Amino acid sequence: MRNDKIAIGVDIGGTNIRAGAVSNDGGLIGESFSVSTNATERKELILSRIVDSISRIITQNKLSISDIQGIGLGCTGPLDVKKGLILECPNLPTMDYFPLRSEIEKAFNLPVFMNNDANAMMLGEASWGAGRGASSVLGITLGTGFGCAIILNQKIWMGATETAGEIWISPYGDGYIEEVVSAAGVCKLYEKLSGLKASSKQIAHLANEGDQFAKAVWEEFGKAVAFALSWSINLLDPEIVIIGGSISNAFELFYPSLYESLVKTICPVPAQNLKIVKAQLGDNAGFIGAAALVF
């Protein structure tokens, strides 16, 4: 039996399932594992992949059940966290109202902790990443969608109905802010300006190469993120703002317009101390954050 405390974290998205063993100081133990979710298949098959991912982490890293303190699940939502249910989830369309937590508990006879992927990821960043040591963290994830998490004293603030941080639905222009502050929004604006189709990753590359249309896209993107954050910063006065998700790889491209816009729209005192940083845990952030739910 090992002396250190270990949790298994699982990041469950519409595209991939990623799992890893994590120590209570945030260190990755051994190798992680990833498999395609195949989200349109039957729920039993998706559950089987989740269970198999956890089993592989245990066997390939030569762990025993007695070594493991618990299992953390960071899952695309919406969720009923108290009941451990996936609700009507567009990214997992065959798993509506599926009791995921209890199924994993039955499979391994271990405590299982579950939260949405944005909350889990930012708990990991607050515990072991860019927000380590901060008492209040506001985190956003930018990628396929727009997620937000509030971490106070190393605990996720869920709100009365478990929907704290759902700012993606904030009105913006003729629609919602997520329609702009997402990979699809980046691609749509670039096509509108240039007449060309490209992925968000390609648009970041083009901007770095000097493409004026691509640079304009990231400038507008930063302004939109600032709009979304300004209300939250004025309300919460967080010690640090962390930006993660796949689009955070373009952080240097949109940060200047984000910062410039924010300092004009938030209260003067927090504006003087504003700290906005890129997430640090990288591709492992999802399952490391899920493991943080256990400790």
Q: Predicted segment positions?
A:
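Conserved PLP phosphate-binding loop immediately N-terminal to the Schiff-base lysine helix
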Residues: 115-129
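A charged helix-plus-loop insertion that forms the helical arch/lid used to bind
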Residues: 84-94
